[in-house]
Structures are given as structure tokens and as C-alpha cells.
From Swiss-Prot:
Cited SMART domains: IlGF
Protein name as catalogued: Insulin-related peptide 2
Tissue specificity annotation: DAGWWVPPQSARALGGGR-amide: Expressed in corpora cardiaca (CC), corpora allata (CA), antennal lobe (AL) and gnathal ganglion (GNG) (at protein level). Expression in CC and CA detected in most animals, in AL in some animals and in GNG in few animals (at protein level).
Compartment(s) where it occurs, according to its Swiss-Prot or TrEMBL record: Secreted
Classification via PROSITE patterns: INSULIN
InterPro entries xref list: Bombyxin, Insulin-like, Insulin-like_sf, Insulin_CS, Insulin_family
One BP annotation, GO: neuropeptide signaling pathway
Signal sequence coordinates: 1-19
Positions of modified residues (Arginine amide): R63
Proregion span(s): 20-43, 67-86
Entry keyword annotation includes Glycoprotein: no
Organism of derivation: Agrotis ipsilon (Black cutworm moth)
UniProt family annotation: Belongs to the insulin family.
Length: 86
């Protein structure tokens, strides 16, 4: 168990170092592994309140139908951008 925690911390440090270097391309297996690493332990969005569908659509804006592949494989992205997909 301790091995997995240490391994996760090492990977997190590696991700932090790569984010300091700027942006990178993440595609395929590398994208899924990096997302899993970045999102590991991240808190899920609050589901404690409910918004009617009409109001939710009005609040949407933002990303539209773009996903992590559009953001990180077709153009470079940072770890901070990847965190928005957790």
C-alpha cells in the first residue's frame, strides 16, 4: 500500500515538473494516463444542489462540446487545463 502512495506522489511530482515547463501534447494512452493521474483524488463537483435543465443550459457556456482530446491532443495543453476535465 505504501508503495502505491509513494508511486502516486512521484508521478504527481513529475506532472508538476512537466506543467512548469509549459504545455505539452497528450494523445491516446498518454492522455488517459495523465488524466487519471491528475484527477486522482480530485474532489468531484458538488451534486448537493439541483438546477432545472433550462437554467443549466443557460449557465453552460464555456467549453461546449470540446473535450480533452480537442484541448490536449490537437493542440498543447497544461496540467491546469487538464484539471478542468476532472
Amino acid at each position: 500500500m505504501k508503495f502505491y502512495i509513494v508511486f502516486a506522489l512521484i508521478l504527481a511530482c513529475a506532472a508538476c515538473v512537466s506543467s512548469q515547463e509549459g504545455t505539452n501534447f497528450y494523445c491516446g494512452r498518454q492522455l488517459s494516463r495523465t488524466l487519471a493521474l491528475v484527477c486522482w483524488g480530485a474532489e468531484k463537483r458538488d451534486a448537493g444542489w439541483w438546477v432545472p435543465p433550462q437554467s443549466a443550459r443557460a449557465l453552460g457556456g464555456g467549453r461546449g462540446k470540446r473535450g480533452p482530446v480537442d484541448e490536449c491532443c490537437l493542440k498543447p495543453c497544461s496540467i491546469e487545463e487538464m484539471l478542468t476535465y476532472c
